[in-house]
């Protein structure tokens, strides 16, 4: 993809986040996280960070969700706003993994999808597993200040073949295969990595 922000944006679309939804994000993250949520007219809802990992604090996350949400029809509802909390974007800050296994377990309990922001943690492991591979999707960045760079760029990681197929389709302007005609079956994005990168 063209950058890490596009990766987060597209991952949110693939997670069916839309207008009126809420997405949990850490208080310590790059502005791209809140921007990508806002592009979809969803609301960024910030959760506390752990001072040891700098990532989302699983204990505080659980306490908050347990106290201020309810389950209705398989969805997590914020009791204060009555909006659906559809996803959480935990960030692995400065290459240091957050307690992602605990966050994923809590998210599952509350029916919240996990999209990892692994933009700063390419090559990092947590409990012998690469960061960005614990949730439904992971977002990477290849910006000039990252461990691996292409001058710019990003990627989505997923083990879900349908999500991968849809990500490829949407990131290439939703163009259908055709020998000579430009046919598009839905609104897509020109998010593919530039040829020169």
Where are these regions (language model features)?
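Short, acidic/glycine-rich phosphate-metal binding loop used to engage nucleotide
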Residues: 4, 50-51, 128, 144
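Short, hinge-like loop/turn segments at secondary-structure boundaries
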Residues: 63-64, 130-134
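Active-site region of PLP-dependent enzymes
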Residues: 121-127, 134-197
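Short, conserved alpha-helix that lines the donor NDP-sugar binding/gating region
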Residues: 8-12
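PLP-dependent aminotransferase-like
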Residues: 13-93, 97-109, 113-118, 125
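Conserved N-terminal alpha-helix of the aminotransferase class I/II PLP-enzyme fold
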Residues: 1-6, 28
